[in-house]
Amino acid sequence: MAAHTHAASGVELWPLALMWFGMMAAMMAPAAWPWVRDFHRFSGISGSDGVEATARFASGYLLAWLGYAIGAALLQRGFQQSALMPASGDRLVAGAGAVIFLLAGLYQFAPLKRACLTHCRTPIGYFLTRWRNGPMGGFRMGLHHGLFCIGCCWALMATAFAVGVMNVWWMAALAAIALAEQIAPHGDRLRRILGGVFLVAGLLLMI
């Protein structure tokens, strides 16, 4: 019986991971587009070869987010099994949601967040200093950038556990925030403002 239950849980995990991957791909597409565009231009490769090279860059980027999606799915299953999230729901209980917001708020002020955001704001600088040639060069650069992107946005995306994993409006807001942090002239100020907002939200949920 235990083995059967474990197997069933494993079957359910992958649709959940694919759901998270689809959400991450959709939400990060606006922020990823400037990088994909600049990679294609900077590569200087035209025609079908250029499309193929750009596709490898995008594939590396998506692979990084697939890893995040699997981790998020495992975390959601853990929340459901520990009763921190109702099995039929998509949002953490208030106390756990408060912890998520507090962690996300604190991370907005972390040096790692600032470093990853600086990377995400300078695609041309990255390509000038870290360019890799060869068939797998684009893929490796895409994967590398994807890891930086996760370092910048993982806590933002984790707030979905507190608001609602299937909350379309919150997902749209997160996509807009991720893009604004990257391209807005005062993106670093926005980072700090969001940190304060998340901390206040976490404290309010604890009351």
Task: Identify the function of each model-found stretch.
Residues 107-115, 137-165:
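Alpha-helical transmembrane segments of helical membrane proteins, especially in multi-pass transport
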